[in-house]
Regions:
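Hydrophobic transmembrane alpha-helical segments of multi-pass transport and channel proteins
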Residues: 148-149, 182-190, 337-344, 382-390, ...
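Re-entrant/interfacial helical elements at transmembrane boundaries that shape
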Residues: 80, 113-124, 137-138, 151-167, ...
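Alpha-helical transmembrane bundle and helix-membrane interface signal
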Residues: 124-134, 166, 170-180, 200-209, ...
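Alpha-helical transmembrane segments of multi-pass membrane proteins
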Residues: 91-104, 130-147, 172, 177, ...
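Helix-coil boundary and interhelical linker segments in multi-pass alpha-helical membrane proteins
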Residues: 167-171, 357-372, 435-439
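Membrane-embedded alpha-helical segments and adjacent helix-loop junctions characteristic
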Residues: 47-134, 289-364
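Hydrophobic transmembrane alpha-helices of multi-pass small-molecule transporters
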Residues: 1-72, 79, 175-314, 407-409, ...
Length: 439
């Protein structure tokens, strides 16, 4: 086990150190464990690796990426932003509305894509009013990060949780007779919106915005809504007993997302009488993230086969004792702190089996249901990224946009918004989760 743990720590550090090559580092780690399996050090074969890969998650990710690209190209997000801003009285309300819009979109769309959609509107408003766009774009970024945990398709970490725990789209709203994580995220969002409103309390300059953007195609919006609807419907399908139907059942969410994406791209090709839209849609996919997830599935299965996951679960159980509240607080606090500085995708992927193992050790070894701890892990890992400028990809994207537009973003500018926003969201979100699931 020492060899496996050393290898995992080495490859994890390399993923943090060379961010631009992290998919290849993860793939190298997966290859290393497969080699050890081939040499007989661990019981880990190529067939085991293939079974470890959650192709449903990968298909969901790829399909949503493609549909979101078509949605952005239709200019519907910009139109929505202009329509909303045209009805607000001042800057304070404009920033709050943009943050709300970014959060709403991010519940169904990748966080970085959300920032790319909404940021141009924030920039335009700030320029018209001759104000710094820095706090506006920071507010948009942290709001998009928060809402990513609200639904199954809102963020990569949510999709990872859904795949690992066998959760469907509806489970994020209501699960086992209790409110799902969606409601805790929304309560946290209300608290953090109050923080934003307070931070911008002096920004009372009137806003005058005209609706200028023309939506080029309504179908991508319909496809996005249809994707959500079909994912909900797929949640209620009965599970077949076996064979090809069972295989299709295990891939149902991925097939829905990928099928609608391909339909949208094919329709765009038909409208333009060329294959260019299809090529652009496939170019828009985030292949680095897809390869990273593919590799992590194999790497973490190898780590698990070596006994590292069980040892980590024992360590967490020893630290928290047999008290669920202690474990919950430890998970949330550790996730918030670590995700402020490291990427939450490999962190969540690594911690999900650990959390499952700790839950099995609770209650004197009889085990308890892990849902509370899964939701706590996701909440902490998602919100922790808002503490620092480098804690989440959406933050980095927003800062990149600002720098391209000649703006200087100081760390204290980000912390002034990110820290109180995160504290409010974590306290209310994690607190409500405990009320729903822990008592």
């Amino acid at each position: 086990m020492t060899l496996a743990l050393s290898l995992f720590v080495l490859f994890y550090i390399l993923m943090l150190a060379v961010q631009q090559y992290r998919p290849w580092v993860a793939l190298g780690g997966a290859g290393a464990f497969l080699l050890l399996g081939k040499l007989g050090v661990y019981d880990f074969t190529l067939a085991d690796a293939a079974r470890a890969v959650d192709f449903n998650v990968l298909l969901m990710m790829a399909g949503m990426m493609g549909t979101v690209f078509l949605f952005i190209q239709s200019k519907m997000p910009a139109r929505l932003a202009e329509e909303l801003i045209a009805h607000v009285p001042d800057v304070r309300w404009a920033v709050s509305v943009l943050a709300l819009l970014a959060g709403f979109i991010s519940a169904f769309v990748d966080n970085v894509a959300t920032v790319l959609m909404v940021a141009p509107v924030g920039l335009a408003i700030a320029r018209r009013l001759k104000r710094s766009p820095v706090p506006v774009l920071i507010a948009i970024a942290v709001s998009s990060n928060l809402q990513g945990a609200a639904t199954l398709v809102g963020d990569t970490t949510s999709i990872l949780l859904g795949g690992f725990a066998g959760m469907n789209f509806f489970d994020f709203f209501w699960m086992e007779g209790r409110p799902g994580i969606f409601w805790s995220v929304e309560l946290g969002a209300l608290a953090s919106l109050g923080v934003l409103f307070w931070l911008f309390r002096d920004q009372r300059q009137p806003v005058h915005v005209t609706v200028e953007t023309e939506v080029e195609d309504d179908v991508p919006t319909a496809l996005l809504l249809l994707t959500v609807g079909l994912l909900i419907a797929a949640s209620f399908l009965p599970e077949p007993s076996g064979g090809v139907l069972h295989l299709l059942y295990t891939l149902r969410s991925g097939l829905v997302c990928m099928g609608l994406c391909l339909f949208g791209a094919a329709r765009a090709c038909w409208r333009s009488r060329s294959l260019r839209p299809l090529a652009e849609t496939f170019r828009a996919l985030d292949y680095d993230t897809l390869l990273l997830l593919f590799s992590l599935f194999i790497l973490l299965e190898g780590v698990s086969r070596a006994g590292v996951i069980d040892a980590a679960a024992q360590l967490f159980h020893s630290a928290a004792g047999d008290e669920p509240l202690h474990l919950y607080l430890l998970l949330v606090a550790a996730s918030v702190g670590l995700s402020a500085f490291i990427d939450n995708i490999p962190y969540v992927a690594a911690m999900l089996p650990v959390v499952q193992g700790v839950a099995a050790l609770m209650n004197g070894g009889a085990g308890i249901e892990p849902e509370l701890f899964h939701f706590g892990l996701l909440t902490g890992a998602t919100l922790g990224g808002n503490l620092t400028p480098i804690g989440a990809s959406a933050n980095i994207a927003a800062i990149g946009i600002l720098r391209k537009n000649g703006e200087t973003v100081r760390t204290r500018d980000f912390l002034r918004i990110g820290v109180p926003f995160t504290l409010a969201a974590v306290l209310v979100g994690a607190g409500s989760l405990w009320l729903f699931w822990g008592i």
